[in-house]
Every structure is written in C-alpha cells, then in structure tokens.
Amino acid sequence: MNSMAPVITIDGPSGSGKGTVAGLIARELGWKLLDSGALYRLLAFNASNHGVDLTNEELLTKLAAHLDVQFIAAEPGKLQQIILEGEDVSNVIRTETVGAGASMVASLPAVRDALLVRQREFREVPGLIADGRDMGTVVFPDAPLKVFLTASAEERARRRYLQLKGKGEDVSLSSLLDEIRARDERDTQRAVAPLKPAADAIQLDSTELSIEQVLQRIRSEIAQRDLI
C-alpha cells in the first residue's frame, strides 16, 4: 500500500453503472482497480477451494488478510477480469452457490475487519479506482475525489433486464424492480456502513445520462483536482 497514491471512489446502489464506469476510468488512467463487492465472493470461493468451513471465522480471517487477487479493467463492452491466485475466476464466482457463501462470510465481524485492511492495500501508485458501496465513507475517507453514482430504481431494473435478456435468461422486469428496491432498503438501513454518499462526494444521477456523459463529468472533476 502507498498512502500517498491518489484514490477515486465510485459508490452507489446496485445497477447504477458504477462497476462499468470504474473499469473504464481505471483503464483510461492506467490506474489500479478495486471491485470491493467481489471480495466476499472471492473469499467464499477461495475458502471452498482450500477446504475452509464458511463458519470458521479464524481461518477465514487469515484467508481474507492474504487474499491474492487482481482486478483487470476490461475494454469497453467487455467484463473485467478477476484473477485469484493466478487463475481467472471472473465467471465462476458469480454462481448462486458462491453468492450464498459470500453472504455467510460477510456476516462475520472479524472477516469484515480483515477485508477492510486488505482493501486499503490496493492503494498503489499511480492511483486506485475503488468501486463499491462504502469506499468513500469507510474505506478511503481521505480520497481526493468521491463519486456517488445513482439512477432511479426503474432505470436500474431496466438495465439489468436488458443485460440478462442479452445472456438469454428468462427474467421479469417487475421482479427485478422488486429485487432492486429490496436491496436498496437493506443497503441503506443496515447498521454497519450503510449505503449513503460521503458528505464531500460528487453526486451523479445517471438515469438520463449515457456512460460517456458520466465519464465526461468524472474526467472534468479529475482535471479540476489535478489528479493526473
């Protein structure tokens, strides 16, 4: 970790486009990338690979502290690569089984503390783009640029619907909207690190904006702060 390396945090609710935007900005600047939302899935997957029980807080904490992972920003229109211990696990960590495991490990306080430290270790020169829900409020409160990206629940459901339809999945727009609203409720009301913009965050509503328009706004904020 290099505490002097600049960090740009991009937080927001599920489906806001923060992952896409974070990857594109990281690729454009040549900076490191952190997808914090994937870390619990990665830990659950890694624990299963090493035969560690998902209720063993002590061993999980040790795994979390030494999680060997790299996020590689993808070209526009493609998914980012997630490399765990030298293996591309971008797709395998997205299964329902891994997701259930991620929920289990995320409930363990010592694991959360260990992953907080691990996230901060991603801060390296020339800089870091950190994507998540509490990057600007908890993980990198000193970041020189914090972005809170949102969109209406209806628009986020529509985007997710089109994404899943494109993969050939049979989904209902109304059920996706219900899921997103429920997720928003959980994220904003939870006791630990609730989803909310940092006091000094730039808030961007992307409901009516294209990805390029969002990128242009962030580029402008980067230039104003002389971050590159």
From Swiss-Prot:
Top-tier EC class: transferase
Binding annotation for ATP: G12, P13, S14, G15, S16, G17, K18, G19, T20
Keyword annotations of the record: ATP-binding, Cytoplasm, Kinase, Nucleotide-binding, Transferase
GO cellular component assignments: cytosol
Keyword Cytoplasm attributed: yes
Subcellular location, record wording: Cytoplasm
Keyword DNA damage: no
PANTHER family assigned: CYTIDYLATE KINASE, CYTIDYLATE KINASE/PANTOATE-BETA-ALANINE LIGASE
Family, as annotated: Belongs to the cytidylate kinase family. Type 1 subfamily.
Name of the protein described by the UniProt record: Cytidylate kinase
Gene field: cmk
